[in-house]
Amino acid sequence: MSEVLPAPSEFPAPVTSSPDLLVIAGEHSGDEHAAQLVRDLLQQRPELQVACLGGPQLHAAGAQLLYDMTEVSIVGFVEVAKHYGFFRALFERTLDWIERYQPKHICFVDYPGFNLRLAQELKKRALSKKGGGTIGLSYYIGPQIWAWKAKRRFKMAGLLDRLGVIFPFEVDCYQDTALPVEFVGHPFVCADHQLPFRYDPKGAVLLLPGSRVAAVSRIFPVLLEAFRLAKVRQPELKACVLYPSERIRGVLLRILGEFPELQSAVVLKANSSEPQVARAVLMSSGTMSLAVALAGIPGAIVYRLNSLSYWIGRFVVRVKSIGISNLLLKKQLHPEFIQAAAQPKVLAAALLRACDSDAAIAASRGADEIRALLNPGSATRAADWLASEL
């Protein structure tokens, strides 16, 4: 079933005639990372006027919210194509707002399909510095060119003024371009960042089906059936499912209603500032999988796409793993079950293995290895990087 996206209405005028900074972040993870960046930035420079296309966390951090991008999160070639008209309208609204109000600087956060096209059009319209205009363009958390579409780096060098990356190895990926690239630290390993999860051998099983409606609809039934089968073997098991928005909660409730025997064993919780304790996890491959790995929680990664999107992806994606922790360590810290391999019986067995103490020891060692690789540095390193341009 294809979800219906709300038509983008006209964006509000900025608080000031020309804002200092426009931040554009798609998806819940981008909203979270961008919010921390803006929070740190405004602590240094409270006089700055910041507007954003993002989500509730960016708004809470002090940015004027022009449009909630977290409500329109979609992944997959086919899925994006189905909603081309919507994204085209959103793209034009964004361009019109930028052209009318001329923010001094734009910081793109992840979301490359939208953001790089926008940077290209800003250059074409002579609005960005690369096109002879006045608007500076920074990019925080760049596209995963090490995984696919590596040639984008040359296009980026012609569009952007600078790039801040969150993995140390990414700097080398741009060595053959003229783009200034700086490793600004990963937000999950900064000294003042509290991970959303914590390992506890007596905790619940964590089920993380993702933050996109289509992905949750596809993955959550499989996770619930796997949990049900595992619970037959270990009746004491309980599960906790975290959700990022009321929209996703509605999807989860509908699917959970199809498993009446699990009603008393599965709890739905909104994401919060308090860490969720867990003994094991079944999760999608998104940003939260790295947070789980850093918390030392054993488990497995589950990934299912539209069949055509998956078939196309096999020809363009160059990496052997989809979990960032597995990519960083070059080993399967969390076993991956992709597409047809994501069968409930197999996942149930993986979940039961993850509940074993040996799995917890391996997960803890993996967390230490990842933390050492990401080299935390200054907690405000990303904000310092962006502030130098404002």
Q: What kind of feature is each model-predicted range?
A:
Residues 1-390:
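Nucleotide-activated sugar donor-binding and catalytic core shared by glycosyltransferases
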